[in-house]
Amino acid sequence: MAQSSNSTHEPLEVLKEETVNRHRAIVSVMEELEAVDWYDQRVDASTDPELTAILAHNRDEEKEHAAMTLEWLRRNDAKWAEHLRTYLFTEGPITAIEAADTAGEGSGGDAAKGATAQGDGSLGIGSLKGEAALARPPRL
């Protein structure tokens, strides 16, 4: 996989800066996920409890790195953002969400049986504006 970070399919001179940066991010995610897989295997194979704990900790750090880079991709690529909003943090069959989304039934496909997603990027908590004012004691 190291070769992926040193090579592009097209000459660098013809690529936009944002394309090169996305390439860096994508390769980083690939490397982080590969490291997660390696650490998973080492955790399974280790017979020493302390080493197992260290390896599991290291694996989880790699997951954090992958998540951070995915967030960068979401913030810097509208199509990534659209797809991540459709599929992440939903319930129900993923393929049903995809079918509902491609049928034009909205982001996350609430029409998909059991699916829940907020197409507006919200966590579904709702607004707390005005509620703080109600909870405050009157000024004297």
Swiss-Prot record:
Protein name (record): Encapsulated ferritin-like protein
Effect of mutating E32A: Forms decamers in the absence of Fe(2+), no bound metal ions, 40% ferroxidase activity
Effect of E62A: Forms decamers in the absence of Fe(2+), binds 1 Ca(2+) via E-34, loss of ferroxidase activity
Residues involved in Ca(2+) binding: E31, E34
Keyword Metal-binding recorded: yes
Gene3D superfamilies the record matches: 6.10.140.1960
GO biological process, one term: iron ion transport
The species this protein was found in: Rhodospirillum rubrum (strain ATCC 11170 / ATH 1.1.1 / DSM 467 / LMG 4362 / NCIMB 8255 / S1)
Region entry Targeting peptide, spans: 100-140
Ranges for region Disordered: 100-140
GO cellular-component term (any): encapsulin nanocompartment
